Amino acid sequence: MEHRVVGPGPYRATRLWNETVELFRARMPLRRHRCRFKSYEHCFTASEAVDWLHELLRNSQNFGPEVTRKQTVQLLGKFLKNHVIEDIKGKWGQEDFEDNRHLYRFPPSSPLKPYPKKPLYQRDVIKFPEWNDPPPGTSQENIPVRPIVMNSEMWFKRHSIAIGEVPACRLVHRRQLTEANVEEIWKSTTLSYLQKILGLDSLEEVLNTKLVSSKFIIHNVYSVSKQGVVILDDKSKELPHWVLSAMKCLANWPNCTDWKQPMYLGFEKDVFKTIADYYGHLKEPLLTFHLFDAFVSVLGLLPKEKTAIEAFQLCCLLLPPENRRKLQLLMRMMARICLNKEMPPLSDGFGTRTLMVQTFSRCILCSKDEVDLDELLAARLVTFLMDNYQEILKVPLALQTSIEERVAHLRRVQIKYPGADMDITLSAPSFCRQISPEEFEYQRAYGSQEPLAALLEEVIADDKLSSKEKKKKLKQFQKSYPEVYQERFPTPESEALLFPEKPKAKPQLFMWALRKPFQPFQRTRSFRM
């Protein structure tokens, strides 16, 4: 009974449902049963289905050993509701599924769930703020992107050190980095890290990035106590005092120094029920509805524990500060109760750890729209959270360091050369798109030469340069990029055409040189004539 791991990505809950249905229909043992003096072929009892499916789920890396028999019964009830199975008389949809000897069978066909058509939240790539960006609130659609192309003057300034020409420079401060710029850097970098860890081409199918608040991320990073718990600015969003006192009482059991009420037999069960009732009546789960798909997607990384922890760290940074604080306090209490050997049993039917998972999983993670596997997925996530909450709910140091260094770099004094463009010398990181193998081969062969060839033509066509300066720059270009230069000037003759030799001016002849040499007696001969 192998249940392949369903990795991260969109529609993971639906993919898990279809995978489980296919395995159940293909491998559930069928045999002959008798009921009320009548025999039925190719069927199974409810208890047999619970036994087999429970074992499958417990051995699956997608769900884990924490799956209870009760959850398996609930899942089979959903199978009956969705006509994955039917009772022996062909009834399905309205009947309740119970763990008994009732007979069930598979219908001739069991349709798999189609993948839901979700709105594409955001097709644009995540971008860093530029200095030329309009202020927040203005439209940023159809803004042309100016390619970064270096003209000949900038190129020769960059390479002029090689020939000993260092241009004058001065220190300048960059433009003021606004709070909106910093917030956008935090949001863009965090989402970029999450997208990279999940291995997705885009987050649009698992997360609506428009609902992600950069202010939440920054608050969750910097407004924390020495223990790493978020500190809220708005005290009205704090846990009620009586809930916080009850949580401290169970977390420090039996040393309840803050609890002034009299204790009695079963007191700890009533305190636990009080806490469970408060969390169970929250309007929204702690991990929020709009982050459900993101957290479910991260569950596909659980076989790689370290990677899963990093992904959960980033997802938890996106939570509202009040949700993150409530989650931190709840996980600390749950972990301490499970490790406390002096804590009396809080339930007669479950162990302490299983009780924690079953009680709080739905208030931590659930979908706004009913999802057939949300109970199992929530239990899997809460189990992993309990084992790794200290790592998951702390600020990822690598992310914080990367962003702080980038912000400091943007604010640092820069060296500027006359005529240089600061936005070119310090360009923001950009994101890539996938290209075809043919386009890649073309770019590898010609992509780097085309801009250089254009630069060479610009130098050749520059009429402001004297012949001496132009020859000097062409010689420098030839030394740096001989292949490009050779392609433009394949022969010395082609190079000579660029600098044609001017014809030398002949010396002016005097009029007397054109005459014949002086002949003696010339005047005498003229007399004779």
Curated annotation (Swiss-Prot):
Residues of the site described as Arginine finger: I231
Pfam families: DEP (PF00610), RhoGAP (PF00620)
InterPro entries membership: DEP_dom (IPR000591), Rho_GTPase_activation_prot (IPR008936), RhoGAP_dom (IPR000198), WH-like_DNA-bd_sf (IPR036388), WH_DNA-bd_sf (IPR036390)
Domain of life: Eukaryota
Modified residues (Phosphoserine): S160, S436
PANTHER family, per the entry: DEP DOMAIN-CONTAINING, DEP DOMAIN-CONTAINING PROTEIN 1B
Full protein name: DEP domain-containing protein 1B
Organism the protein comes from: Mus musculus
